């Protein structure tokens, strides 16, 4: 047990991606690049992209319904919905739209924004709500449609991102606590390495008051700095989470990292001395889906039979902010 109130188990997962995709070969007709250039630097083969008729909340709702079905939980029994996203349909948030679409009428719903670390932050937040006894059934969703926020003329960024959603159901349990340990960090001094900033011209309203009138600019990233940051911080934060769980790397059955870049995942697993066969990767199929990437990879691994009940999973999210974190959990109830 955890020394708090209720214990926490993850009882279901689900994911959703758009049917349409853009291959590296097709992308090379849009911007100066090639399949070999992209794969050798990122490991990405294609990315699924949401049509303009598909909303972020629709993808999130599809993933949520699948997770609820696996958990055998009715939407009406959900107490809280946490939507981790940086690309909501509405700047005020999309969680309430998801709540309505899935029929979770009792649930309070709100967005969390922590970029590619968002799902992990949401999972930790859900754990704390359950452990304090506030809620018993929490739906955590990671979803992003970054295809709408990249510069499709910038080959350094447009080759990386895809759209998708993933979700898990967290429930209170009287005996088992399957959230074993976690560690979260932020460093705002490095915000310039990866951001999606609001910029514009000033608009004077009266003497002494000049507001900014503008819009959000496309995503900007310093790839080399993000790589250095991830390779240095991710192994460290996973080891800290393992320490909190009273475990070591030898106890890890699967490593489920934010699917940012295959080079990063390879470097992290090497530093943790984990064999490649323990690393779950679907980067080639989907690219970087930001907050969706961890639950999307987890869901595919569970449904394929790779991840089994009782397996210990180490996971880490890292990205804009800069934010990063690690969590250790046991799969299944």
Curated annotation (Swiss-Prot):
Homodimer. This is Beta-ketoacyl-[acyl-carrier-protein] synthase III. Pfam families: ACP_syn_III, ACP_syn_III_C. Its main location: cytoplasm. InterPro entries: ACP_syn_III_C, ACP_syn_III_N, FabH, Thiolase-like. GO terms for cellular component: cytoplasm. Residues 259-263 are annotated as: ACP-binding. The last Arg residue of the ACP-binding site is essential for the weak association between ACP/AcpP and FabH. The active site is at 116, 258, 288. Keywords: Acyltransferase, Cytoplasm, Fatty acid biosynthesis, Fatty acid metabolism, Lipid biosynthesis, Lipid metabolism, Multifunctional enzyme, Transferase. Pathway: Lipid metabolism; fatty acid biosynthesis. Its EC number is 2.3.1.180. It is found in: Cytoplasm. GO terms for biological process: fatty acid biosynthetic process. It catalyses: malonyl-[ACP] + acetyl-CoA + H(+) = 3-oxobutanoyl-[ACP] + CO2 + CoA. One of its GO terms (molecular function) is 3-oxoacyl-[acyl-carrier-protein] synthase activity. Catalyzes the condensation reaction of fatty acid synthesis by the addition to an acyl acceptor of two carbons from malonyl-ACP. Catalyzes the first condensation reaction which initiates fatty acid synthesis and may therefore play a role in governing the total rate of fatty acid production. Possesses both acetoacetyl-ACP synthase and acetyl transacylase activities. Its substrate specificity determines the biosynthesis of branched-chain and/or straight-chain of fatty acids. Belongs to the thiolase-like superfamily. FabH family.
